[in-house]
Amino acid sequence: MADRNLRDLLAPWVPDAPSRALREMTLDSRVAAAGDLFVAVVGHQADGRRYIPQAIAQGVAAIIAEAKDEATDGEIREMHGVPVIYLSQLNERLSALAGRFYHEPSDNLRLVGVTGTNGKTTTTQLLAQWSQLLGEISAVMGTVGNGLLGKVIPTENTTGSAVDVQHELAGLVDQGATFCAMEVSSHGLVQHRVAALKFAASVFTNLSRDHLDYHGDMEHYEAAKWLLYSEHHCGQAIINADDEVGRRWLAKLPDAVAVSMEDHINPNCHGRWLKATEVNYHDSGATIRFSSSWGDGEIESHLMGAFNVSNLLLALATLLALGYPLADLLKTAARLQPVCGRMEVFTAPGKPTVVVDYAHTPDALEKALQAARLHCAGKLWCVFGCGGDRDKGKRPLMGAIAEEFADVAVVTDDNPRTEEPRAIINDILAGMLDAGHAKVMEGRAEAVTCAVMQAKENDVVLVAGKGHEDYQIVGNQRLDYSDRVTVARLLGVIA
């Protein structure tokens, strides 16, 4: 199928499909070009079948479209000389179609999927860094972007469309990648975007409140994440046993690797396991001692906080389960670097320590504050806000958490989008017992500046919510803004 022929592509579903050479595959009629395959899916916001005439006018070689019903599944028509093949449940089949089109890229590298509410980005980055230190050519796909390590290109979504995912993976294979760590979002799982991928391993970090504007409740959110293990080729399963949901899943996955730093593992009950036996936190990270089915060891980590110890242990267990030698992993562990915008520490002589993190859920904010407290000799400041046009229920929860775990809470804008910024702030303040003690400042840059300039040398300022992002969405505008750049400028250092 090197020439990407329509007949070969559709062989499993439509044996009598016509022969047509295909150049590229796209869901977007606006970029469809001569020789392309246009796939007209019915999406949440638009029906791609409406754009078939536009695609034909632009010279596409063939079209695959959503069938009206089961009776028309496999039907072949011709419009202006262009074959149009109708398939039912096209969204569900799209990952498999794209996989065949791009020559099954997940067969040609070690692909690790990481799902969970928090920790996906750090865990994928650690997996990619560590495997590369052991000789792989490693890549990442997720929130920060897609690409080989050091050459990551920013993306809009954690998990792209089913076609985008297979296309990106194929590009990575073409660049020589032998290992890829991919963030797998709940949206991506529900919408079948990774349905046909063959994961060598699948990692579950944790589950807490997020995306309830989409899933409705925690039960449906958990069910979405569980799809990675119940409906996908998940390979080795690595599960965080410190998470309540993780413990439930371990009971259903007897062959999974259980990982804990809170003594939630009984070695006599789990087939394979890894647990921290002692963790000592210090200014530059933590010293971690652990025992496991593969042996015991000690790691010096440059990452801040308990949840990053958990992320590191999950990455370690995954690589051990995939067959990388423990001795080699221990030799290279000290070379692992913190991830951009994930508990990223900025320091300067005579200035407070500033930590920039992506925490934008109640659980993530609590863990980030607890992590920062471990390294704080003075007062702990928290600068944060909540996104507009998103789950409003988490706003008072995050206000309560900031009030409880920080000494000084500075409430500001995040990405207000089309909501009134002050209304979002008021929702946050409603969760505080004494909102009068919070500092309120709508302009995010001004709020960060206020906190950093007023904090003392022994204080720690956590700037939470945006992490690696270099933009702010106000109304329908995407404005240039970066917490990292703002903090670096205030401290006189390089971001």
Swiss-Prot record:
UniProt organism field: Escherichia coli (strain K12)
The reaction(s) this protein catalyses: UDP-N-acetyl-alpha-D-muramoyl-L-alanyl-D-glutamate + meso-2,6-diaminopimelate + ATP = UDP-N-acetyl-alpha-D-muramoyl-L-alanyl-gamma-D-glutamyl-meso-2,6-diaminopimelate + ADP + phosphate + H(+)
PANTHER family: MUR LIGASE FAMILY MEMBER (PTHR23135), UDP-N-ACETYLMURAMOYL-L-ALANYL-D-GLUTAMATE--2,6-DIAMINOPIMELATE LIGASE MURE HOMOLOG, CHLOROPLASTIC (PTHR23135:SF4)
Residues that coordinate or bind ATP: G116, T117, N118, G119, K120, T121, T122
InterPro entries: Mur-like_cat_sf, Mur_ligase_C, Mur_ligase_C_dom_sf, Mur_ligase_cen, Mur_ligase_N, MurE/MurF_N, UDP-N-AcMur-Glu-dNH2Pim_ligase
Mod. after translation: Carboxylation is probably crucial for Mg(2+) binding and, consequently, for the gamma-phosphate positioning of ATP.
Gene Ontology cellular component list: cytosol
Cofactor(s) this protein requires: Mg(2+)
Binding site for UDP-N-acetyl-alpha-D-muramoyl-L-alanyl-D-glutamate: L27, S29, H44, Q45, A46, N157, T158, T159, S185, Q191, R193
GO biological process, one term: regulation of cell shape
Localization, UniProt: Cytoplasm
SUPFAM superfamilies for the chain: MurD-like peptide ligases, catalytic domain, MurD-like peptide ligases, peptide-binding domain, MurE/MurF N-terminal domain
Protein's gene: murE
Function: Catalyzes the addition of meso-diaminopimelic acid to the nucleotide precursor UDP-N-acetylmuramoyl-L-alanyl-D-glutamate (UMAG) in the biosynthesis of bacterial cell-wall peptidoglycan. Is also able to use many meso-diaminopimelate analogs as substrates, although much less efficiently, but not L-lysine.
Name the UniProt record assigns to this protein: UDP-N-acetylmuramoyl-L-alanyl-D-glutamate--2,6-diaminopimelate ligase
N6-carboxylysine PTM positions: K225
Inhibition and activation profile: Activated by potassium phosphate.
Keyword field: ATP-binding, Cell cycle, Cell division, Cell shape, Cell wall biogenesis/degradation, Cytoplasm, Ligase, Magnesium, Nucleotide-binding, Peptidoglycan synthesis
Primary subcellular site in the record, as a coarse category: cytoplasm
pH-activity relationship: Optimum pH is about 8.
